[in-house]
Amino acid sequence: MYPAHLLVLLAVCVSLLGASDMPPQPLNLVQFSNMIQCANHGRRPTSNYMDYGCYCGKGGSGTPVDELDRCCKIHDDCYGEAEKSQKCAPYWTWYTWKCGSDGPQCDDSETGSRRFVCGYDATAAKCFAKAPYNKENYNIETRCQ
């Protein structure tokens, strides 16, 4: 490959990186997203959960609107508890897990914060998979005050 071609390729790659409107995700959220896909067997994209109800996605307030939103509130509360009592950073905690026939399973060798966060994520992912998804509850922050 000619040096000029390499420069053009590099320029394209750099411009694509700058054009991305998605902020970098904490490592754990990537794992959690994969767990959700494992639990629901790919039936629903993870993006459907990013702005659902009052608690699915960043932050949360008000009263959960349904069973799925309650799953998100419980998960948020668990992360808050992990930050306080376990003194860990759940959004950045990396753990080992596998996708089994009955959903995500945490590696038994994990201990401490890794075990707690993996357990919270696996439980939430299974809860998401069981809960009905109501399209009317997507992007409703005005009802969550």
Curated annotation (Swiss-Prot):
Snake venom phospholipase A2 (PLA2) that inhibits collagen-induced platelet aggregation. PLA2 catalyzes the calcium-dependent hydrolysis of the 2-acyl groups in 3-sn-phosphoglycerides. This enzyme lacks two of the seven disulfide bonds found in similar PLA2 proteins. One of its GO terms (biological process) is phospholipid metabolic process. CDD domains: PLA2c. GO terms for molecular function: calcium ion binding; calcium-dependent phospholipase A2 activity; phospholipid binding; toxin activity. Belongs to the phospholipase A2 family. Group I subfamily. D49 sub-subfamily. One of its GO terms (cellular component) is extracellular region. The active site is at residues 75, 121. Ca(2+) binds at residues 55, 57, 59, 76. Disulfide bonds join 38-99, 54-144, 56-72, 71-127, 106-118. It catalyses: a 1,2-diacyl-sn-glycero-3-phosphocholine + H2O = a 1-acyl-sn-glycero-3-phosphocholine + a fatty acid + H(+). Keywords: Calcium, Disulfide bond, Hemostasis impairing toxin, Hydrolase, Lipid degradation, Lipid metabolism, Metal-binding, Platelet aggregation inhibiting toxin, Secreted, Signal, Toxin. Residues 20-27 form a propeptide. Residues 1-19 form the signal peptide. SUPFAM superfamilies: Phospholipase A2, PLA2. It is found in: Secreted. SMART domains: PA2c (SM00085). Its cofactor is Ca(2+). Binds 1 Ca(2+) ion. This is Acidic phospholipase A2 S1-11. It is an enzyme of class 3 (hydrolase). Its EC number is 3.1.1.4. Expressed by the venom gland. The lineage of its organism: Eukaryota, Metazoa, Chordata, Craniata, Vertebrata. InterPro entries: PLipase_A2, PLipase_A2_dom, PLipase_A2_dom_sf, PLipase_A2_His_AS. It comes from Austrelaps superbus (Lowland copperhead snake).
